[in-house]
């Protein structure tokens, strides 16, 4: 089932903060004045309001959070909001002590140039990241002086889409602390009239919800208000933490006295079409199921469960078959069969015996399914007034038979020839989702990701419920010739029960007296035509009262829908066509101030007397590639970085300084060193040293490298062991093993791990902490050298001030001075004197390599080299960092 998110409520309010010093001591607090309730580490979030205004399914949403720093020193305050992936951010403002810093939407390339020019020091990453199944997280943080107030305000818009007969509004509430004034205020205006409206919360009892929640609707207007008091927010009567942690949902629908409804405002029109009471068109459905080895275990079990449930819901008028593909292709029957009780019972027995096998031959599986549907129609095995549907489920990329994506697309396109839709279900993250989406879109279907979770079978069933009841086929929405411009998509292969078709456009003449819309389609029994006529004077009078919401809503709805459809069309366009589509979508995105995949929101924020600029981009559904995932944090050439690579060379680009310090650690192979240890986030990173081959392997004088790395998060009970051969992910007692030959992304709540075949892997924690491990491969027959690993910290700004380790101790700013530069023993490498941490050291100018972009060549990094295992620069001596094991 696809859940339809209502944008003004699809957000998580995650008010958090990072401090620049150590945590407060409880003993110190005893002597301080008492702080107002709801203050956490000196920061009080005293107001959060979500204001939502919905007019004719188009939602305009404003999230406002107000905070004050009641501490006696500056603090960092973070503002996090989760919003639907289908929503477009339209504005963000940051106000500190009455001074407002607005965001502006610019072309992505222009924004990137501004970003690189503006940031002169420190690290600033992209602000919007994918978060879970349907959400994106918008994050911005700012330093707030003692006693100062800050206001965050985010605005975004979205067209609500109807699913299974209703619009669902979903709110994930998680303020993380008591908020003196917390409010959700939603106003709905529907010219057709509201037929039902309800609201509920998973995190609060009905008794408490009843007094905090009010909901009402009458005629065209609906209202929902949720205002819990401080006491109602408490997790227990005497607790100071909040129970607001869960889902808040609102559902509603509108009256449908006629199949269609047309609204016209300021020269723009929108046509909603959702007929009811029609008989269901019989469907001919071919399920093409991946049974390759990667589907083993839980995936194949959940697939069987979902298919059995789908069989229970099949109607006797339907026809079906199952096509299984691995290295080859097998089918349940040679042709489609009717869903009689006897055939369904036989189908259940077949499904129960589905087993995983070997490789993934997507091409042959799809072509067999297409051939079966085509033949059923040609041989008159299915009713004349029926509709065909092809559904594919796969969890990976094609790796046998025809495996070139572009060739598979060509073969499928030529075989289907536009006669029926293809729906692609991508199971998990180890697949090319862009390919599945392009393949489906160009064949009049869509792609859907099925998340590897306990409810995967329910997700599969939910998809089937969407397409189970076609009421019309070949639907065409027609308007007066020469009377309209810039029409959105007006042709659809199916209309499914409980959904809604939406078409928008512009009128050539705003002063017309009448407007007519015709909808034609093939029904189960006959061809149908629905006509909607609009008297413009009556329309103007009827819509005057909606002005209190927002008057240009139809124009913005048209722009939103046009951009959305252009971006879909762009995915399969080539050459000049793609350039023209891109230019049109970009022009509209800029005109209407939408953050889309073609634009970025530029946010300038004050930081220590110097403004810094960050950009908010629109992430896509496809998993972020490694290059994107870690380069967003390195967009400025002056961003601080920390890494260890080579023999092993530790490289520290000092925060706030345009200079770099490096040192080596000489230890015998087998030694395990602590690189990062953060007791607050629970993150720890260790590395084990390897030596050269043969007799040199155990020598302390030969070259040494890191051959094994361990990354763990104690609070998540998660660990990763990385060697030059394999990667082992441990989640509690469960282990998953991958090789460096894989290209795969593994996600779970709070974490994403991406392996890029034979290159690198990216580990990203939700808090804004990212690492990259680079694989260095040498000639296997080399007599001395062997493969080794490099470790790079590319985003550490959310790690605590208590972080330590050979790398971690340098995440916080520190000062040093270099002077008395003089000739060294090597004429090309001058010596100098460095004063750091109260030590006076002799250092040497040299260079190392940064291998993130190219593991074979690398990029030169000039640094001051500290001798003797970093003595005087690192805390203590290097042997203090030796630990007994990786974990």
Curated annotation (Swiss-Prot):
Aspartate 1-(chondroitin 4-sulfate)-ester modified-residue sites: 647
Domain VIT: residue ranges: 29-158
Extent of the signal sequence: 1-21
Pfam families named in the record: ITI_HC_C, VIT, VWA
VWFA domain segment(s): 282-442
Propeptide: 22-33, 648-887
InterPro entries in the record: ITI_HC_C, ITIH, VIT, VWF_A, vWFA_dom_sf
Subcellular location: Secreted
Residues carrying sugar: 91, 580
Record PTM: Heavy chains are linked to bikunin via chondroitin 4-sulfate esterified to the alpha-carboxyl of the C-terminal aspartate after propeptide cleavage.
Keywords for this protein: Cleavage on pair of basic residues, Glycoprotein, Protease inhibitor, Proteoglycan, Secreted, Serine protease inhibitor, Signal
Gene Ontology MF terms in the entry: serine-type endopeptidase inhibitor activity
Keyword match Glycoprotein: yes
SMART domains: VIT, VWA
GO BP terms in the entry: hyaluronan metabolic process
Statement: the UniProt record of this protein carries the keyword Electron transport: no
UniProt GO cellular component terms: extracellular region
Function field: May act as a carrier of hyaluronan in serum or as a binding protein between hyaluronan and other matrix protein, including those on cell surfaces in tissues to regulate the localization, synthesis and degradation of hyaluronan which are essential to cells undergoing biological processes.
Family per similarity comment: Belongs to the ITIH family.
PANTHER family: INTER-ALPHA-TRYPSIN INHIBITOR HEAVY CHAIN FAMILY MEMBER, INTER-ALPHA-TRYPSIN INHIBITOR HEAVY CHAIN H3
Assembly notes: I-alpha-I plasma protease inhibitors are assembled from one or two heavy chains (HC) and one light chain, bikunin. Pre-alpha-inhibitor (P-alpha-I) is composed of ITIH3/HC3 and bikunin.
Protein name stated in the entry: Inter-alpha-trypsin inhibitor heavy chain H3
């Amino acid at each position: 089932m696809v859940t339809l998110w209502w944008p003004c409520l699809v957000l998580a309010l995650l008010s958090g903060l990072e401090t620049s010093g150590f945590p407060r001591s409880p003993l110190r607090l005893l002597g301080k004045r008492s702080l107002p309730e709801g203050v956490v580490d000196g920061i009080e979030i005293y107001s959060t309001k979500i204001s939502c205004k919905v007019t004719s399914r188009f939602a305009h949403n404003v999230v406002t959070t107000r905070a004050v720093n009641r501490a006696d020193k500056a603090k960092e305050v973070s503002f996090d909001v989760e919003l639907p992936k289908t929503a477009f951010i339209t504005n963000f403002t940051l106000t500190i002590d009455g001074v407002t810093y607005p965001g502006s939407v610019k072309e992505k390339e222009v924004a990137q140039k501004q970003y690189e020019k503006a940031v002169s020091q420190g690290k600033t990453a992209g602000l919007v990241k994918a978060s879970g199944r349907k959400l994106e997280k918008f994050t911005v943080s700012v330093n707030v002086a003692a006693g100062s107030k800050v206001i965050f305000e985010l605005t975004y818009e979205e067209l609500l889409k109807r699913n299974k007969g209703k619009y669902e509004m979903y709110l994930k509430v998680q303020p993380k602390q008591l908020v003196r004034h917390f409010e959700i205020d939603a106003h709905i205006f529907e010219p057709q009239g509201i037929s039902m409206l309800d609201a509920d919360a998973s995190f609060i009892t009905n008794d408490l919800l009843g007094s905090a929640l009010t909901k009402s609707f009458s005629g065209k207007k609906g209202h929902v208000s949720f205002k819990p008091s401080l006491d109602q927010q408490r997790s227990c009567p005497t607790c100071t933490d909040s129970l607001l942690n869960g889902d808040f949902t609102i559902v509603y629908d509108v009256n449908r006295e006629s199949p269609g409804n047309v609204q016209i405002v300021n020269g723009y029109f929108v046509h909603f079409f959702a007929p009811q009471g029609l008989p269901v068109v019989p469907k001919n459905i071919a399920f093409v199921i991946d049974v390759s080895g990667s589907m083993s275990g839980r995936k194949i079990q959940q697939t069987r469960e979902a298919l059995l449930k789908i069989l229970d819901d099949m109607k006797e008028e339907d026809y079906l078959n199952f096509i299984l593909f691995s290295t080859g292709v097998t089918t349940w029957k040679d042709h489609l069969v009717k869903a009689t009780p006897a055939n369904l019972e036989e189908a259940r027995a077949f499904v129960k015996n589905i087993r995983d096998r070997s490789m993934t031959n997507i091409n042959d599986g799809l072509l067999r399914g297409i051939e079966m549907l085509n033949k059923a129609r040609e041989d008159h095995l299915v009713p004349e007034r029926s509709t065909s549907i092809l559904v594919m489920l796969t969890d990976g990329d094609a790796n046998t038979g025809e495996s070139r994506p572009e060739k598979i697309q060509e073969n499928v396109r030529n075989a289907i020839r536009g006669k029926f839709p293809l729906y692609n279900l991508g199971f998990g993250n180890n697949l090319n989702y862009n390919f599945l989406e392009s393949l489906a879109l160009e064949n009049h279907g869509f792609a859907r990701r099925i998340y590897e979770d306990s409810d995967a079978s329910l997700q599969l069933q939910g998809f089937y419920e969407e397409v189970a009841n076609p009421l019309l086929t070949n639907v065409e929405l027609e308007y007066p010739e020469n009377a309209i411009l810039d029409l959105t998509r007006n042709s659809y292969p199916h209309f499914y029960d409980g959904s809604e078709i939406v078409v928008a456009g512009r009128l050539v003449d705003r002063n017309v007296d009448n407007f007519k819309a015709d909808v034609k389609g093939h029904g189960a029994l006959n061809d149908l035509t629905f006509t909607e006529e609009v008297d413009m004077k009556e329309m103007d009078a009827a819509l005057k009262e909606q002005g209190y919401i927002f008057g240009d809503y139809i124009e913005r709805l048209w722009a939103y829908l046009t951009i959305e459809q252009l971006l879909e069309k762009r995915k399969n366009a080539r050459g000049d066509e793609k350039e023209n589509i891109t230019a049109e979508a970009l022009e509209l995105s800029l005109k209407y101030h939408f953050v889309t995949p073609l634009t970025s929101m530029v946010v300038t924020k004050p930081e220590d007397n110097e403004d810094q600029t960050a950009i908010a981009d629109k992430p896509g559904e496809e998993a972020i590639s490694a290059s994107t995932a870690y380069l967003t944090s390195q967009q400025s050439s002056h961003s601080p970085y920390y890494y260890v690579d080579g023999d092993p060379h530790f490289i520290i680009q000092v925060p706030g300084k345009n200079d770099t310090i490096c040192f080596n650690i000489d230890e015998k192979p087998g030694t395990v060193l602590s690189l990062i240890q953060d007791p607050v986030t629970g993150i720890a990173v260790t590395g084990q040293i390897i030596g050269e081959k043969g007799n040199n392997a155990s020598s302390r004088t030969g070259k040494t490298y890191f051959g094994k790395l361990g990354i763990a998060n104690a609070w998540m009970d998660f660990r990763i062991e990385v060697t030059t051969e394999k990667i082992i992910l441990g989640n509690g007692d469960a282990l998953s093993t991958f090789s460096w030959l894989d290209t795969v992304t593994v996600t779970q709540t709070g974490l994403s791990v991406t392996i890029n075949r034979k290159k690198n892997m990216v580990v990203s924690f939700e808090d804004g902490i990212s690492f990259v491990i680079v694989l260095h491969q040498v000639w296997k027959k080399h007599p001395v050298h062997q493969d080794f690993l490099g470790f790079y910290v590319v985003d550490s700004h959310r790690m605590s001030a208590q972080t330590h380790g050979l790398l971690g101790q340098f995440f916080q700013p520190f000062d040093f001075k270099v002077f008395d530069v003089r000739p060294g023993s090597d004429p090309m490498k001058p010596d100098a004197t460095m004063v750091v941490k109260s030590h006076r050291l002799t250092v040497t100018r040299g260079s190392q390599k940064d291998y993130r972009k190219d593991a074979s060549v690398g990029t030169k990094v000039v640094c001051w080299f500290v001798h003797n295992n970093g003595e005087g620069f690192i805390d203590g001596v290097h042997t203090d960092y030796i630990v007994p094991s990786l974990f």
